[in-house]
């Protein structure tokens, strides 16, 4: 539970924090006691998220300046490095919890998908996750600190989905990236895990036609869409020492969809 304050001494960097799952993760980690560096391509949205966060180490819901918002396009190498530098300059330490949640979709059938739409989705979802993971790991190793890196993939990365060749490929890549990072970084005390959300109620899924939502919901054994908070619960667990012997895992949060 949040009242345990499992992350009282942690600094958490969350990308894609401006809405949906990223925002819910930021709120949950703050409720667990972490100081949160909320990053989004939309800097104003990141600021809005920070306003929702309570004071780290307390159950007070009023912001006390213990969190900070950042703007960055994580698909660009210099921007990702600069983000980590800015976070360290602001908090005087590297983040010990890093959650890569920044992601986009540009759906189209394989026969008609443009190279531009393929490249952009791969750049944000996969390359961006790589760049943030690399920069955060470098900062942690340099400081001698332990950490938990949590990359948000998707159940689609495991099973594929019609009209999402680019998205499915990017999220499958996130799983492979995270497992490899876990093998390489374990000796430094850095755990790396991925989370695979299923059909979650977010601004991204709200754009889907109702008949499509109904069709997918009917395939979920638990009978309903998930909430962003369902994903945030798992991320909080993986960020904490309650999962201290877990690394390289891919945790599905899907209500049983596609199991």
UniProtKB/Swiss-Prot annotation:
GO biological process, one term: estrogen metabolic process
Keywords: Acetylation, Fatty acid biosynthesis, Fatty acid metabolism, Lipid biosynthesis, Lipid metabolism, Mitochondrion, NAD, Oxidoreductase, Phosphoprotein, Steroid biosynthesis
Oligomeric form and interacting partners: Heterotetramer with CBR4; contains two molecules of HSD17B8 and CBR4.
Protein name: (3R)-3-hydroxyacyl-CoA dehydrogenase
Catalytic activity: a (3R)-3-hydroxyacyl-CoA + NAD(+) = a 3-oxoacyl-CoA + NADH + H(+); 17beta-estradiol + NAD(+) = estrone + NADH + H(+); testosterone + NAD(+) = androst-4-ene-3,17-dione + NADH + H(+); 17beta-hydroxy-5alpha-androstan-3-one + NAD(+) = 5alpha-androstan-3,17-dione + NADH + H(+)
N6-succinyllysine found at: 158, 171
Organismal lineage: Eukaryota, Metazoa, Chordata, Craniata, Vertebrata
Function field: Required for the solubility and assembly of the heterotetramer 3-ketoacyl-[acyl carrier protein] (ACP) reductase functional complex (KAR or KAR1) that forms part of the mitochondrial fatty acid synthase (mtFAS). Alpha-subunit of the KAR complex that acts as scaffold protein required for the stability of carbonyl reductase type-4 (CBR4, beta-subunit of the KAR complex) and for its 3-ketoacyl-ACP reductase activity, thereby participating in mitochondrial fatty acid biosynthesis.
Residues that coordinate or bind substrate: 154
Catalytic residues, chain numbering: 167 (proton acceptor)
Family classification: Belongs to the short-chain dehydrogenases/reductases (SDR) family.
Residues recorded as bearing N6-acetyllysine in the entry: 66
GO cellular component, one term: mitochondrial envelope
Pathway(s) served: Steroid biosynthesis; estrogen biosynthesis; Lipid metabolism; fatty acid biosynthesis; Lipid metabolism; mitochondrial fatty acid beta-oxidation
Entries under PROSITE patterns matching the protein: ADH_SHORT
Keyword Transmembrane helix belongs to the record: no
Tissue localization of expression: Expressed in ovary at protein level.
Chief localisation class: mitochondrion
Enzyme class: oxidoreductase
Keyword Cell membrane: no
Binding site for NAD(+): 13-21, 40-41, 72-74, 167-171, 200-202
EC number annotated for this UniProt entry: 1.1.1.n12, 1.1.1.62, 1.1.1.239
